[in-house]
Amino acid sequence: AYDRKTKEVFIPNEEIREEFIRSVKNGNRRELVKAVELSDKLLNATIRKDEATVAELIEEAHAANTSPKFYNNEQALRSVIIMAYLSSVDDYCRFEELASGKGYIDLLFLPTKQSAKPALVIELKWNKSGEKAIRQEEEQQYWKFAETFRYKGPILLVGINYNTKTKKHTCRIKEARKELL
């Protein structure tokens, strides 16, 4: 995560933070490089609207960064997704549980003024569907954050679902309709 006031980056999930510190202290940066490469792929797949690749990469990150004891935990998934989008720090400001429209956006990646990338509105679901997440984003008018931030660029609505029985992730990505903006 990035604290705009202090201009510092931090990792909010304790398990991930400890693993990051261990990796850096031991000089073993191969895992860190792999995490950044996965993050680059994930961000690019999201922007390309490659739903299958996004679901696959999130599943990979979830398996690699969550202990079996906490695998079926919503907060663990949220932390994994935040960490998986690590590469976003170069082009985005991240917001969590941001009030917008008639509800709260789980995760918003708002591009910096220098970035030409689209805004990413991410809704997480548990034992539902990516389609249901997208429907919620539309019905709750999450795209209204654009008014608050005076953002006029493209917006991608991203719905990520995790099924606890199958341990599978699914993803739906849709451009917000221009007439809504």
Where are the regions that the model predicts?
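Arginine/glycine-rich "motif VI" loop of SF2 helicases in the C-terminal RecA-like domain
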Residues: 143-152
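Extended alpha-helical interface modules used as scaffolds for assembling large macromolecular complexes
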Residues: 1-135, 139-141, 167-181
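Short, conserved secondary-structure transition motifs
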Residues: 160-168
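Hydrophobic/aromatic beta-strand patches that form the interior of the parallel beta-sheet core
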Residues: 120-122, 156-160
